[in-house]
């Protein structure tokens, strides 16, 4: 698989994501449903703590990727839904630490509410 970042305006690169990712020669595509801060039994965790919810949502995303034989390095698109979009942007260091040098296309969407006590939900598309 070949990934080519598309950034006609480079300001997003410093934030750790690309405006678009052109993927060629991939074999499989995994489309992940929204992942949030739940434990293995589906019970909501970390009410009121955006950072902890984001970390656990990433853990859950990584578990799905691993079950498909993939890692965060295979993610080409990450949609972030949050009850406070500005707070998520302030927490981008968490995403950058987990994704490392792997950049992806992303949208951060502020939403009025999420189920249960969730503050953030992640949807991902991964390819290999």
Where are these regions (language model features)?
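N-terminal presequence-like segments and the immediate start of the first folded domain
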Residues: 1-59, 63-76, 82-128
């Amino acid at each position: 698989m070949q990934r080519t970042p598309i950034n006609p305006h480079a300001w997003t690169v410093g934030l750790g994501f690309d405006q678009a990712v052109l993927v060629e020669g991939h074999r499989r595509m995994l489309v992940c449903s929204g992942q949030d801060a739940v434990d293995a039994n589906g019970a909501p965790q970390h009410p009121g703590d955006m950072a902890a919810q984001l970390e656990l949502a990433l853990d859950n995303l990584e578990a799905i990727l691993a079950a498909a034989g993939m890692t965060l390095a295979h993610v080409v698109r990450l949609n972030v839904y949050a009850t406070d979009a500005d707070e998520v942007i302030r927490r981008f260091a968490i995403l950058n630490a987990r994704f490392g040098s792997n950049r992806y296309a992303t949208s951060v969407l502020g939403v009025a509410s999420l189920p249960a006590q969730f503050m953030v939900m992640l949807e991902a598309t991964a390819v290999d």
